[in-house]
Swiss-Prot record:
Organism field: Leptospira interrogans serogroup Icterohaemorrhagiae serovar Lai (strain 56601)
GO biological process, one term: glutamyl-tRNA aminoacylation
Location relative to the cell: Cytoplasm
Assigned EC number: 6.1.1.17
Motif range ('HIGH' region): 13-23
Keyword tags: Aminoacyl-tRNA synthetase, ATP-binding, Cytoplasm, Ligase, Nucleotide-binding, Protein biosynthesis
Name of the protein in question: Glutamate--tRNA ligase
Region named Insert: 320-347
Classification lineage: Bacteria, Pseudomonadati, Spirochaetota, Spirochaetia, Leptospirales
CDD domains in the cross-refs: GluRS_core
InterPro entries per record: aa-tRNA-synth_I_cd-bd, aa-tRNA-synth_I_codon-bd_sub2, aa-tRNA-synth_I_CS, aa_tRNA-synth_I_cd-bd_sf, Glu-tRNA-ligase_bac/mito, Glu/Gln-tRNA-synth, Glu/Gln-tRNA-synth_Ib_cat-dom, GluQ/Sye
Coiled-coil ranges from the UniProt annotation: none
Signal sequence annotation: none
Catalytic activity: tRNA(Glu) + L-glutamate + ATP = L-glutamyl-tRNA(Glu) + AMP + diphosphate
CC per GO annotation: cytosol
Amino acid sequence: MNQSKEVRTRFAPSPSGFLHVGGARTALFNYLYAKSQGGKFILRIEDTDQNRSTEDSFKIILESLKWLGVNWDEGPEVGGEYGPYIQSQRLNIYKEYTEKLLKEKKAYRCFCTQEELEAKKKQSEAMGVPYVYDGLHANMSDEEVQEKLKQGIPYSVRFKTPSKTLIINDIIQGKVKFETKLIGDFIIVKSDGFPSYNYAVVVDDALMKITHVIRGVGHLSNTPRQILLYEALGYNIPEFAHASEIVGMDGKKLSKRAGATSILAFRDLGYLPETFRNYMALLGWTSTDGREFLPGDELEKIFDVHRCSKSPSTFDVFKKPKGSDEEVVTNFSDLTQIAEAMNPKSKLNWLSNRTIRDLNISKVLENLLPFLMDRKDIPAEVKNVNNPILTSIVESVRVYLDNLTQAPDYVAEFFVTDLKIQSEETIGFLKDGEGPKVVNEFYEILKNSDPKTDEDYKNLMSKVGEVTGQKGKTLYMPIRAATTGKSAGLELPILFPLLGKEKLLQRIEKTSKETGISLSN
């Protein structure tokens, strides 16, 4: 039984880098389960590795969680009953429990040097057996220990591991058996006085009354050490749930490089937090009715860690590598490279399109504004969530968007007033071959019809193709050149309803004057 009936989960990142894909999923699963059970979600910062922990990383992790909508009930910035919530501020607490374990002979000081330990490891390797610490100092007398302490000899503190079989009933992985004799006496306090990961985690989880430890399957091997420490300290053991491995499109474990992609990169690539939350929740979990698009606060209501699968979950955001050792992206901090490596048919894009379509328009505009600010081809007065023209444009095109970075080009196209032919190639599409005939027919048919929707314009262009005998590039490129001045850009059936009939006719007439193409009267 747990110490409290209230479900209490936690996320305990190390502030030594970005919040990456695996960490984000762990945080989300803990948050969602706590919310669905009416419990509390705690954020704790594990900064005992002082060589790697940085203030910048700490700030980025908090920013990432806030963007994702994973708001903590207790932790940094908000406080709580069981603080402090930063491990480096809890050293006196760990010291107190270390003294208790030493006094009860459940732990001992180890005076082995790093060189001696390395020699033992090499000896085990040479013998072809796993390295297990031999407990050299486990039975030293108090007098011997005090003598070494007087000499100022550095030491670590090791837990005296009892030999037994541990059976763990993991919520996701099922029954898992461990033989503790294969673990050996492990370090709980390092020679610098800081607690080891496994030790600090247990003390903190116990004192913060954590009822469920939800984390990646890579941490399963830490669980027996932690259970032994819970037992030694006399605390109830929480329930464990180890989420499935995340693999890439090639079915292999997500590379450290791909997996290290900051989730803020997806924000900067135009994905809404609602979308990314939805996508991450589906990496190893399914709803009872099989639905995948779960907008608003549905996830908080229905998420159940007992419905997580132990089968690997596929992170399909990046394209499948062509070669076995090839990375699709070489620099996972470069937004351009990340964008180019994105899989256009990913579930993330499908969810993103659904979210952008269904989300309240004011929320879409609010998230879109940062992507408009640097665009000089969009009037300043339009860059406002209350601007009716911007609202109208985004309402018209959002059904076509996979992410918000695609929207500024649509907005900018609406405000083109001085249409200019961009290149010799574009002029060629207008003047060569059947180009003039295609432009004339499009102009005439458009002038005598009243298209409104993308389907209307598709049908109109099909009619132009039938009359001129042109299709594909020889049909669309002259029309694109005459209406946009470019040889590439937005899909015409999407763009044309946005511009409207009158603006299109005006653009063709201007192009005609600029290039000398005569239009039928």
